[in-house]
C-alpha cells in the first residue's frame, strides 16, 4: 500500500466514524482543491452518495468560475448544497475594496460571521432545488453541531496543533490546551452536550499529497488552478479582490 492509499484509508475511516457517531453533520466546501478532495473522499466513503449536506459561504465576491463549478458539480453528483451569506454586511457595504472597511474586517463579516450564524441556523440558509436548479430558502434552521473541514496541519502553525476530532465551545471557540489525545488511530468521539465539533479528515495530507491525489483520481477541479495559455494560474482561490494569479506554466 503506497502513501496515498494510507492517507485515503485514514480519511475514509474518519469520515465514516463521524457519520456513525454524530448528528447534524455538515461539510464545508470552499470550492478549493482541498475541500474538493474531501468531497471526493466522502463520495468514496459512502459508495458514490454523500449523505452529508455541503455548506458554502458565499461572499458574493467569489470568482464567477467558482460558483459555476459549485453548482454544476452539485447537480451532477446530486449533492445537498446549502449556502449562507451575510446579506446585512453586503447591504451596508461593510466590504473591501468597494466599501467602508479594510480587507480584514471584510473577511470577518463576509466569512467568519457568516459561517458562525449559518451553522447555528440564526441566519437564513439557501438550499439547491435540483428540479428547478435554483436556490430556495431552507426551512430547516436546526444548527449544525459537527462540521467536517478540509484543513491540513502543514498550512500554518496553529493547524499543526489540531486534532482529527476537535471540540469547540458553544461559541465555536477553540481551546488548544483542551484537546483530546489521539494515539494509534484511537479517536475520542464522545463529548459533552452542547459541544461543537470540527472534524479534519485531511489533517495529515500535504499540499503535494493533494495534487498527487487529484492527478491519480482525475478529480475535477476549478479551471482557475491551471494555466490557460497565458502563463498564469491561481495557487489558491477566494474572493477576487484578494486573490491573485501567479506566473506558472502548470
Set out the residue ranges of the language-model regions.
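Nucleotide-activated chemistry modules centered on ATP-dependent adenylation/adenylyltransferase
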Residues: 1-250
